[in-house]
Swiss-Prot record:
Involved in protein trafficking. May be involved in the down-regulation of membrane protein levels. Widely expressed, including in liver, duodenum, kidney, pancreas, lung, spleen and brain. PANTHER family: LEPTIN RECEPTOR GENE-RELATED PROTEIN, LEPTIN RECEPTOR-RELATED. It is found in: Golgi apparatus membrane; Endosome membrane. The keyword Transmembrane helix applies. This is Leptin receptor gene-related protein.
Amino acid sequence: MAGIKALVGLSFSGAIGLTFLMLGCALEYYGVYWPMFVLIFYFICPIPHFIARRVSDDSDAASSACRELAYFFTTGIVVSAFGFPIILARVEAIKWGACGLVLAGNAVIFLTILGFFLVFGRGDDFSWEQW
């Protein structure tokens, strides 16, 4: 039952993050949909982790080079997702208020993704591998 509560909490926080992103795009004052491109970063963020889990040997207690490379790529993706709306605001493609809403949405979404892997990445009976 604890896994279901965690899943509901994660889906709620994901909905809040996407609401911030949509508000940054769809409010009449902002009205520009360029920040929606951060959705690409949301989708590619867990891919290095998935590849590292499949390739690396879990018998090592220490961190492997493959896992460290996956952390590096994931960090680059997350930093790019935070930098993209700032660059759009600097070149005046979007307003700074929209940038703030998108950055708030980024923080909530990436914390949700991190929470997902912390809750369901343990490898117990109720894990993310079932989904």
